[in-house]
Amino acid sequence: IQQLLAQEPKPDHIIIETSGLALPQPLVQAFNWPDIKSQVMLDGVVTLVDGPALADGGVAHDLDALEAQRAADEELDHESPIDELFADQIGAANLIVLSKADMLDEAGIARARASVEQQLEAPTPIIPVSGGAAPMDAILGLEMEAQAHARSEHSHHHHHHHDDDH
């Protein structure tokens, strides 16, 4: 991040895409480091979820492939169960992008939404997207810092464990 900030002209936005296996909270906390916080505002955390998998009652269509990806990733520094990882990612989100909505009918989208909503501790927008095309105006400008206080008041010391995975 510091290398990006040293560039001229300075970037207007930095979008960090983490692996679907990443724990979001350590990255969010890194934006509170004094050297970073004085230069960058964390606008929000966007979590991408698999619409068809959620509609079918899971979080990924191929859990074996997901586990193989985890095992092969040498930089992965945690072994959280998939259900906890999914709950952490949903809990950190300021926006949830429901992917592959074009593969679902209205009932499937409703099932996928319900699966996500049961994980949420605070109201969080969920936007269905098709063909991987998420509207940038929805992703940029989330104003996470303005929402952070309200969220922390609501979920302070709340820890939930669920049986879903991402």
Go through each PLM region and give its residues.
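Nucleotide-state-sensitive switch-loop elements of NTP-binding domains
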Residues: 1-84
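C-terminal accessory "lid"/substrate-recognition subdomains
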Residues: 66-166
